[in-house]
């Protein structure tokens, strides 16, 4: 199973790497969870695949 780095973007568009998660679905859900939990802190998120 591939691993992904969940990268959060804060309000200043700085990248903040938060977690390494196994599986695309779990990584995406984690990014959405962090967006909802800290919506005043994060603007967006994206995933980077690890090889």
Q: Which residues does each PLM region occupy?
A:
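A structure-centric signal for secondary-structure junctions around beta-strands
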Residues: 1-3, 15
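Short linear/disordered segments characteristic of secreted peptide precursors
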Residues: 12-14, 25
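A short beta-strand micro-motif
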Residues: 3-10
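GIY-YIG-like beta-to-alpha core
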Residues: 19-27
């Amino acid at each position: 199973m591939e691993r992904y780095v969940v990268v959060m973007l804060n309000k200043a568009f700085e990248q903040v790497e938060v977690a390494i998660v196994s599986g695309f679905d779990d990584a995406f859900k984690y990014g959405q969870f962090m967006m909802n939990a800290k919506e005043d802190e994060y603007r967006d998120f994206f995933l980077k695949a690890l090889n």
